[in-house]
Amino acid sequence: MDCREARAVVSGTLQRAVSRVSGDNIISPFRGIRYQAAESRDLSTRIAPPYDVISESLSAELRAGDPHNFVRVELPEAHEADTEEANRYTRAAATLQNWLSRGVLIRDEGASFYILEQEFSLEGRSWRRRGVFALVRLPEKGERYVLSHEGTLAAPKADRLRLLQACQTMTSPILMIAEDSGQQLAGLLGRTHGEPAATAQDSDGVMHRLWARQEADYLGAIREAVGPGPLFIADGHHRFETAVTCRDGMRRMLPQAAPEAAFNYALALIASAGDEALRILPTHRLICGLGKAGVARMKEAMRARFEVEERPLADAGEVQLSSPEPGRHVLGAYCGDARYYVLRAGEELTPAGASAVASLDVSVLHDHLIDPVLATLHRQPKLTYVTDESQAMAAVDRGECGFAFFLRPTRVSEVLAVARAGDRMPGKSTYFYPKAPAGLVISDASAEPI
């Protein structure tokens, strides 16, 4: 038997063992790593957003606010003198180990599912979103119980992989959605008893409350509610693919590792698809560097492909607040000419039988307007993304960008349909809010058992 055959035997044996251990259960409780709560359960100065929404200014603010803020692990600073042996990733790992050795962070003694409640204000009302922190068994090749809706980029994956390999810890969770058609999971997530184990208010004003549940019947009920999946990735595609890559590398190095090794799992925050507090913000498009000719060409194409209605600027936000128009795509546009344009299109752009991804407002905008026009220009305009409509319009008014396009929020049902079909949305099609925090509870990703 050569090396290739031996590896295949080991891989097949491990896959069968994982299946025997887990059965239809794709999630597991775990011994979470958390901040020591002996002094205070308020972790407001210690949690951080996930790495990809931390600006330089916010990073500096978090660092200055608390010497133990988790941003030091989630998004470590680079130094000019960094080398392959000593760099931002090795510093993050050293910080994590230092906090563990000093008791700043502790690992819970018993395995738990951790219930998170996030209370926030949006669209003029208050919301409470609930989810469960759990370990999700990483799929083997060909298994489709974790479904994606978004493509990934090499650079963020390389960054997260180096951090994961250095720390051997999942520092922030992947936000996943369970279809939960019978609302079994949603009902269980609402059963929070007693005072939370930890609370935190983040820089956006979101209040986070965490409960650790260890009762055997409750753990079993959560696993049963999620069952064999599928789970849909809402936020964290790069972290998910990174976890799979890391898992594969660890298996090559440690072919005899147990199926229960922590690297076979990823940390996730799982929410119910039926939770109305599972909000998606619209992500608007700004096109900068068009020039006068490019703006004129975009307006010409806009009128050729869509029904265009001109409105006063006071109506600028109405496209996001209007009721859905069945079978119709509704978009907004602004190019600084004191008018707000409402664009509509229907079956002429997405006929009956069109794929789930082709039927999205964001796909119609890109496929029938932005991408065709940009392809005809000699210059290379820059496409940027914002969630705040007023910021987009201000950028046009300042002359920084030539065109702003406004989208209605993608619906959760659309995300699930695209993922189920195996399609990929255009980049920045979804912005789930609020983000799952980094540092509230993290998980081991080493070869140790979960």
Regions found by a protein language model. Name each.
Residues 2, 10-450:
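Surface-exposed, charge/polar-rich loops and edge strands
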